[in-house]
Amino acid sequence: MNKAVMNKAVMNSENTTQDQSITTTDLDFDKLNGLLAVVIQDAKTQRVLMVGFMNAESYARTLETGFVVFFSRSRNKLWMKGETSGHTLQVVSMSTDCDRDALLITVKANGPGVCHEGFESCFSRTRVNNNWIVSDPQTFSPTDVYSDTKEVAK
């Protein structure tokens, strides 16, 4: 992935593609106090795995490394998804919304799940008859994976 620019092919009026470069300065980090909302989607299954946030620094680190790096609002620091569990998110593609204040990142998920509660997706609960139920099986044991951290308690 290019370190300075995210490229997106777009259709022009002659129905041919042209390259449109989006730099960090083209993204609107101001709407959410220096952050972008980031939706993470599995490139193979198209399932939404999680939602996180990036600041300009974590966005740049993501472009540099090719792995998703978030900004943690609760810890007030950068964190690469999988730095504790090994369940990293390798960037396949990135898209921005029309306001350029949110990103959709499709990824190759390296590991059995992304949720710190042991699920493939953080969206593992479904509303049924006015109740939230766990609708997915756990894909790993959070106690085993995060035995030396506070991640399980979050």
Show the residue positions of the predicted features.
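Compositionally biased, intrinsically disordered low-complexity segments enriched
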Residues: 1-14
